[in-house]
C-alpha cells in the first residue's frame, strides 16, 4: 500500500512497527510489512556493528572522522534503529584521506572502483559487510565557490565531531556548522 511505499521512500520502514495494528492493513499486508521491518532491523544492527568496528580503528589510529547521513541522521530519530541504511558514509579531513584509505585496506576492506560512481568518495567492500564510502568531499553544489565553502565548513568541523549514543553505538556526528 501507499503507506509502506512512503515509509520506504523516507528510509523509515521500521518506524511504526509497534503500531502496525492501528494502520488497518490486511493480514497479508501486515505480515509483509512486519517481515520488511524485521529485515530492516537486522540490516541496521549488521551495519552498525561493522561501522562500530571501523570507527574504533580510526579512533585508535588517531584519524579524525565523522559519519555522514545514515547513523548520524538516525541519532535524531525517536527510534534510531528504524532508519533504513544501505552503506556507511565516512568523511575525514583531506590531509587524513590517504591514511584512512590505507587503514581500511589493512582492515581487509577492498577498494571497489565500481562503487565510485562519482569522485566524491572511494568505495570499499568486504565480504559480509555493508559498503563503505570514504568521502573526499561532500558537497554536490554546482557553484564551485559554494561547494568549497560547504566542504571547508565540514572539514573544519570533523575534529569537533561529537561522539553520540545511537541506540547503544557511539557515532561521531558533525556539530552544528
Give residue ranges: language-model regions:
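Conserved NTP-donor binding/palm subdomain of two-metal-ion nucleotidyltransferases/polymerases, i.e.
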Residues: 1-86, 92-177
